[in-house]
């Protein structure tokens, strides 16, 4: 009988397990889902009514009176679950906590025009120069009630508190320009959904870029938006890569609230963006975050790199209230949140 060296075979078996543990099956193709992963993940979303809560771009959901809202379309060309973007809305604070979505080299392309209003299937809100019954920004009354918003009535219409007369613009979180691909249903539904008031925060025009400097729109938030939109179009970004995006404003701490419009609607003192880039072919992840003070002074010409921080630092600035990218396996999440990968992102 031939005897085998069990010690050597045990060593090979342990090595095989170690090699297997270096990879991760996070199953995020065309939709960012974190389901199916084999690596430990103790802080992932487990209490939810919509499976979209397991997507990589979705932070850990808050308890209490917060509502997780998923905006979908019937088109699954760019997302296997038809997810456009997701929102967490705090019904007590009556404010958006964050909006999150994915960008790929495919869904960032398109020629869909910016939504300009005119459909009667949405609840009419305020438009600064509007004289007709067309509208641009909408209350989502499918997922929320009108009482879940701060609103007021005037001239037979219900309005939100974000408008120039109050000193602020509608600040998109899921950017309209990030949703220009056509859903094929003929009404631009994908872009139109970004105009829900659940996806808005009040922003100074000098901050969000509606202010013009030397004839061009300028603002540090716009600078960040352009960077996020252009990155999946760059040579760095491969066809199967995914950029996971989460943006928001500070609403949870009194010292991080700039003011309240008419004593009601929160105006964040800071805004942020958190990004994770997955190179699908090599299963490599890179992370970066941006932190901006919300000010009426125009900083549109500033270098974006000066606002870059790690995702871990962003979480600390937010008082650890938000756990970003919690659906990533713990080992990947820890590594990707540790440093701001400015070189990887070309900053």
Task: Identify the meaning behind each predicted range.
Residues 1-11:
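Bacterial N-terminal signal peptides that target proteins for export
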Residues 18-21:
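C-terminal motif of bacterial Sec signal peptides marking the signal peptidase cleavage site
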Residues 23-347:
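Domain-level detector for secreted/extracellular nuclease and nuclease-toxin modules, and
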């Amino acid at each position: 009988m031939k005897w085998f060296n069990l010690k050597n075979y045990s060593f090979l078996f342990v090595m095989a397990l170690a090699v297997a543990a270096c990879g991760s099956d996070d199953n995020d193709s065309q939709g960012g889902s974190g389901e199916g992963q084999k690596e430990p993940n103790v802080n992932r979303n487990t209490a939810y009514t919509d499976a979209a809560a397991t997507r990589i771009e979705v932070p850990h959901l808050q308890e209490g009176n917060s509502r997780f809202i998923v905006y979908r379309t019937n088109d699954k060309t760019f997302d296997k679950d038809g997810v456009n973007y997701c929102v967490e809305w705090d019904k007590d604070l009556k404010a958006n906590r964050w909006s999150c979505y994915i960008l790929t080299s495919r869904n960032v392309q398109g020629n869909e025009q910016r939504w300009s209003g005119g459909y009667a299937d949405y609840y009419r809100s305020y438009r600064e120069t509007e004289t007709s019954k067309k509208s641009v920004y909408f209350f989502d009354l499918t997922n929320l009630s009108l009482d879940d918003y701060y609103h007021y009535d005037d001239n037979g219409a219900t309005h939100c508190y974000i408008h120039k007369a109050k000193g602020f613009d509608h600040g998109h979180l899921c950017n309209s320009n990030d949703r220009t691909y056509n859903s094929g249903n003929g009404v631009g539904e994908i872009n139109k959904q970004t105009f829900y008031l659940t996806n808005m925060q009040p922003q100074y025009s000098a901050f969000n870029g509606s202010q013009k400097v030397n004839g061009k729109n300028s603002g540090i938030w716009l600078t960040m938006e352009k960077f996020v939109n252009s990155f999946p179009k760059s040579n760095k970004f491969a066809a199967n890569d995914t950029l996971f995006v989460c943006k928001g404003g500070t609403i949870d701490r009194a010292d991080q609230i700039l003011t309240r419009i008419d004593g009601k609607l929160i105006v964040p003192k800071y805004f942020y963006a958190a990004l994770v880039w997955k190179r699908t072919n090599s299963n490599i992840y890179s992370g970066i975050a941006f932190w901006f003070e919300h000010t009426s002074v125009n900083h549109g010409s500033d270098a974006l790199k000066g606002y870059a921080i790690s995702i871990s630092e962003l979480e600390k600035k937010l008082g650890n209230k938000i756990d970003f990218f919690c659906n990533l396996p713990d080992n990947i999440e820890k590594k990707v949140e540790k440093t701001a990968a400015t070189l990887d992102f070309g900053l």
